[in-house]
Regions:
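Non-catalytic substrate-recognition and accessory regions of acyl/acetyltransferase enzymes
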Residues: 11-18, 52, 56, 68, ...
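Extracytoplasmic
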Residues: 18-20, 60-62, 155-162
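Periplasmic peptidoglycan-binding/anchoring modules of Gram-negative envelope and division proteins
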Residues: 25, 29-97, 126-130
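Single conserved hydrophobic/aromatic residue that forms the stacking wall/gate
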Residues: 1-10
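Periplasmic OmpA-like peptidoglycan-binding domain that tethers envelope proteins to the cell wall
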Residues: 70-171
Length: 172
């Protein structure tokens, strides 16, 4: 990728901050409250946005929140129950391998594909941020879901990643 000069960065006035936690979830799990790594990550995000970043989050600022939920390659046998804790998703848009697609996960559908599991992991992050990161209550937030399904099995592939892009960050 071409390197960007500092001038470009200042022109764009974008702050881009990425947070990541690995080995977040038990196999088949999607509840972020049951994952120590995920909850540590959520606390780091909350502290950052209510601390250092709060000065960039004036009312009406646009913030893009790109949340990537990942699943490993372990096949889902049968169906994992979904309790609806993060809402019901019908034709929810998401990106996988750079392509826009859509996905449905409801209490009645349950979870039969790793993509659905990965989406719910991302949805848990979305839910936490909306409920707990108070400084994002007055900004215009655009959430985007990305889903990754690894070709390998293992805890390190069951993870979440959150990227925040604050537009016009340096304008008062």
């Amino acid at each position: 990728a071409p390197s960007r000069g500092l001038g470009d960065v200042y022109k764009r006035q974008v702050i881009n901050k990425e947070f990541s936690a690995k080995e977040d979830f038990p196999s088949g799990g999607y509840n972020i409250e049951k994952s120590n790594a995920a909850m540590s990550l959520m606390k780091i995000i909350k502290n950052a946005f209510e601390g250092d970043f709060s000065k960039y989050l004036a009312e009406g600022k646009q913030v893009k929140v790109i949340i990537t939920g990942s699943a490993d390659a372990s096949p889902i046998r049968g169906r994992i129950a979904y309790d609806g804790r993060y809402g019901e998703f019908t034709d929810e848009p998401y990106y996988k391998d750079g392509n826009l697609d859509n996905i449905t996960v409801t209490k009645s559908s349950g979870i039969t594909q790793n993509e659905q599991l990965a989406l719910l992991r991302a949805a848990g992050v979305h839910s936490y941020i909306e409920k707990n990161v108070t400084t994002l209550n007055n900004t215009k937030n655009d959430y985007e879901y990305h889903v990754e399904v690894a070709k390998e099995r293992g805890g390190e592939f069951r993870k979440i990643n959150v990227e925040f892009v604050i537009m016009d960050a340096f304008q008062q």
